[in-house]
Each structure stands twice: as C-alpha cells, then as structure tokens.
A protein has these predicted regions:
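Hydrophobic, regular-secondary-structure patches
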Residues: 1-51, 58-61, 93-94, 144-145, ...
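A short coil-to-beta-strand element that immediately follows conserved catalytic motifs
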Residues: 30-33, 153, 186-191
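Helix N-cap / beta->alpha transition motif
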Residues: 14, 136-139, 195
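Structural beta->alpha junctions
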Residues: 2-11, 26, 42-48, 119-123, ...
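Peri-transmembrane interface segments
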Residues: 173, 184-200
C-alpha cells in the first residue's frame, strides 16, 4: 500500500491530467489523450475489424495521418462530440471496395453511424493499438461517450520541443503522473511507457 491506498487498485488517466502536465512539463510540445478499442466496422454488406482510436486534433504531431482525402479531426468535433471519423486506407478499401473517395459516406460501429470526413494514407506499422491503415480515428470526446468512459482515457501521447527528447524527460513525466494519481514513485508496474523515438 502507498499513501493509504490499496496496492492492487486500478487507475486511469483523466482529462484534468492534461492541463497539469502541460503546465509542469514545459519541454513537451504536445500532450494529447488517446482512447483505443478493437471493434467491428460495417458499411452495407461490407464488414471488417480494426482499432478505433479516439484522438484530438493535435494528435497529428504524434502520428501524421497523411490525408489522401478530406480532413482530420477538428476542435469543433471534440467540442460537439461529433460522430465523424477518419479511415485508415485498408479499412476504407474493405468497407468501400468500389469507391476511391468515401468522404461524406457513413460507416457503422457498435450500432452507431459515423460520417467519414477523411482518409489517411499512412502505412506505418508503428502505432499503439495496431497499424494506421487498420485504424479508424474519431474525436476522443465522442468515443468517451460511446464507451461510457466518462472523463477517462487510455493513454497519453506527447512530443517534445526542439532541443529535447522523450528519453530525456521520460522520468520527469512518469513522476508527475505518479504524483497526480498517488502512485508510489518506486512502483515500476503501475505505469507503462512506449518511446516511439527509440524505434527509429
């Protein structure tokens, strides 16, 4: 036990964490939330499976979508919890095999209809939750609501300002998160981090 709390308690990121980390980690250029879930997608008779990823507009700094059609997630989509999405190229070709540009059409996910606003041509296999081509991106606020997640999200993604690396501030970030969630600073199991920089 630490700070009077059970040693096996569950915790998750909350939206309020973002503002605290942005203030306390000035080396970070972007601090952005991510929610992900493996699920089924459908358009008429076409079905496929993949990752749905709830993101904010500044997630482009983490994983550049390289749009071939349409647009990315915008601030108004977050604010209004809009049911819009950006399709990875593989998902788009499976759900719309006879269409080169399905922007404006709708896909079904867990009984909810999402309007396609963009197509990502990013083919990188580096990504949490699966390859970009098999991912559907949508506003994280909308996905929070659809999944009944309240104010919580799965992962924090960040980039650093020029002159800094994620490796150089990783320990500082981890300690800040542990302080926010009353986690023992020496606990190596409570927090998992993936440094994509080190993969290149």
């Amino acid at each position: 036990p630490y700070d009077g709390l059970s040693s096996d308690r569950m915790w998750s990121f909350e939206t309020g964490d973002l503002d605290v980390l942005r203030r306390h980690i000035p080396e970070a250029a972007v601090v952005t939330p991510v929610i992900f879930n493996w699920t089924d997608f459908k358009h008429r008779d076409c079905k496929t499976q993949g990752t749905v990823k709830g993101v904010s507009p500044d997630y482009v700094a983490v994983e550049n979508p390289k749009l071939s059609h349409g647009r990315y997630i915008q601030q108004a989509d977050l604010r209004d919890c809009r049911k819009v999405c950006v399709l990875g190229e593989k998902i788009a070709s499976q759900l719309f095999p006879n269409e080169s540009n399905p922007v404006g059409k709708y896909i079904e996910m867990q009984g909810i209809y999402l309007q396609v606003v963009g197509i990502s041509s990013l083919t990188s296999n580096v990504g949490v939750g699966g390859p970009a081509s098999r991912t559907v991106y949508m506003p994280y606020t909308t996905l929070q609501r659809l999944l009944g997640r309240g104010d919580h999200f799965d992962m924090l993604a960040l980039t650093t300002r020029p002159g800094h690396t994620v490796s150089s501030i990783q320990r500082k970030i981890e300690l800040e998160i542990k302080k926010l969630h009353r986690i023992d600073p020496s606990d190596q199991q409570a927090l998992m981090s993936i440094n994509v920089e080190s993969m290149f």
